[in-house]
């Protein structure tokens, strides 16, 4: 399964490489200059470019047997669940391609059908090979001059990818991806010697269908159908000379940047699983969302938002025939520094789950008499701070020193490379907010903590920290009463919990408490000035 997922990511890179055929250029839009720049752009994606026949003359460039190939080495999950050396090779073959000067621009002509082969080798596993075809209907690509470089405009009625062959597994795999009413524009230029691009793209609809069947006695099948509407994407890249988008680590080290945002409308996901344990059907819809990703010297930023989600599960192994729930909004925002440095670097992680509303059938499993309030639950967490990064968190550029499946990997004193690599060290942690509400109770917290050099951790697994957290609790006594009434909590344990609550917190109202937890850095912990440790 891991190899197949690895192949899917490789397919995305292959499609991105084809998009580059309708992207970067620098000089005036003459056919030969555009072709030279297209080659440079493909190489920026990590592809080797070889043409069986290349004719440059007059106002046109004609290419035959154009082969784009790339090889990526690294590590992925092996068949035994451990990290293993891997190599992925992608090959695209274009029977013919051409660039022709027409009017005030250059028209790029690509085949209606392009074969793609993706081969993945993972140490200890059989190679996995995917072969398919990328097809375009009504594809138009035109290149014209812009103030700061070149403007590439491209559009197609339909773009599809269909899998023809799947080798390396006893099962069978069918895969079809479809993009409708796709259009976009790319502006290219230079910032010094750095290559820059600015892109905007949109599509009316995208769909994917996947079917996998394992014929073994303990096997089964998975059917997946996914659709989303109204895709709108924007992106920017700044790639220093000698770097490549295919190697984001090198790009970041050289001061480059890669960023992209995608907004989308209604989505639908249908999954049907059938196996020895029975059948399971999952359906999910949402009213839309957004995805953003960027990488640069300041780190990796990842953001995800989803609005109006609804999930339904049906299956023989479920405790009831159907489980369902809705979520008003979910979001994730993460910044992770990736380059080594002596100075502290900022990080953040924020997650929100608003309006989690469980269907009554789920509530009835553990609370059939509706003792607890069934209001939607919510979670909102935002943490930020600074940390030092002793070693790069991104892999070095792949090349001669990259691991190869079946070859001896470099080892340290203990025989395992990377096991003793120092982890990032926390310097400051700011708990901007922590807000959890469910079943009529609510917990809120905020505060700031700092690492103490040479101090004593307050708990195993934590660095020595000093600082204060302010905590507010409401509805806890009502929750304890409800759990006792439901028979989920013994009265003695409820009494003990109330006693601890009175010890570490002070009452601020009816079923409301507040507490200040202070860490001393020397291992001491106090609550409202009273020593806990």
Feature map (PLM): residue ranges:
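Glycine-rich, small/hydroxylated-residue low-complexity segments
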Residues: 28-533
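Gram-negative bacterial Sec-dependent N-terminal signal peptides
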Residues: 2-27
């Amino acid at each position: 399964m891991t190899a197949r997922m690895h192949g899917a990511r490789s397919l995305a890179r292959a499609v991105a490489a084809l998009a580059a055929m309708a992207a970067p250029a620098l000089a005036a839009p003459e056919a030969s200059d555009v072709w030279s720049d297209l080659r440079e752009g493909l190489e920026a994606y990590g592809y080797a470019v070889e043409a069986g026949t290349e004719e440059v003359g007059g106002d046109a460039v004609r290419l035959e047997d154009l082969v784009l190939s790339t090889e990526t080495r690294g590590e992925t999950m092996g068949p035994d669940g451990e990290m293993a050396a891997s190599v992925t090779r992608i090959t695209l073959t274009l029977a013919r391609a051409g660039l022709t000067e027409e009017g005030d621009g250059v028209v790029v002509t690509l085949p209606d059908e392009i074969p793609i082969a993706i081969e993945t080798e993972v140490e200890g596993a059989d190679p996995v090979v995917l072969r398919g075809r990328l097809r375009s209907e009504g594809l138009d690509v035109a290149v014209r001059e812009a103030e700061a470089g070149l403007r590439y405009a491209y559009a197609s009625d339909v773009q599809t990818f269909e899998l023809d062959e799947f080798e390396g597994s006893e099962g069978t795999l069918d895969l079809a991806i479809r993009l409708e009413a796709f259009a976009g524009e790319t502006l290219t230029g230079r910032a010094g010697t750095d290559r820059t691009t600015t892109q905007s793209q949109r599509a009316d609809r995208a769909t994917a269908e996947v079917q996998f069947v394992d014929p073994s006695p303990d096997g089964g099948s998975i059917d997946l159908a996914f659709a989303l509407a109204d895709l709108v994407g924007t992106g920017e890249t700044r790639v220093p000379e000698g770097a490549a988008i295919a190697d984001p680590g090198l790009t970041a080290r050289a001061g480059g940047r890669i960023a992209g945002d995608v907004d989308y409308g209604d989505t639908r996901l249908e999954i049907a699983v059938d196996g020895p344990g029975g059948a399971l059907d999952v359906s999910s819809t949402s009213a839309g969302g957004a995805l953003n990703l960027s990488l640069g010297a300041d780190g990796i930023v990842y953001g995800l938002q989803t609005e109006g989600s609804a999930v339904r599960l049906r299956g023989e192994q479920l405790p009831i025939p159907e489980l369902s729930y809705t979520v008003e909004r979910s979001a994730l925002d993460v910044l992770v520094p990736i380059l080594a440095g002596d100075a502290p670097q900022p990080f953040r992680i924020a997650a929100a789950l608003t309006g989690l509303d469980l269907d009554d059938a789920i509530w009835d499993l553990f609370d059939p008499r509706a003792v607890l309030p069934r209001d939607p639950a919510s979670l909102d967490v935002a943490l930020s701070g600074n940390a030092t990064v002793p070693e790069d968190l991104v892999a070095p550029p792949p090349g001669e020193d990259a691991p190869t499946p079946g070859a001896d990997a470099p080892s340290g004193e203990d025989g395992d490379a990377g096991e003793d690599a120092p982890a990032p060290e926390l310097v400051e942690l700011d708990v901007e907010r922590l807000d959890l509400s469910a079943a009529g109770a609510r917990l809120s917290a905020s505060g700031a903590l700092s690492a103490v050099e040479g101090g004593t951790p307050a708990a195993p697994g934590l660095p020595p920290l000093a600082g204060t957290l302010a905590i507010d609790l409401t509805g806890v006594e009502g929750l304890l009463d409800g759990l006792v009434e439901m028979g989920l909590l013994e009265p003695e344990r409820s009494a003990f919990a109330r006693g601890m609550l009175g010890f570490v917190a002070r009452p601020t109202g009816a079923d409301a408490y507040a507490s200040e937890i202070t860490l001393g850095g020397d291992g001491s912990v106090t609550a409202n000035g009273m020593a806990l440790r």
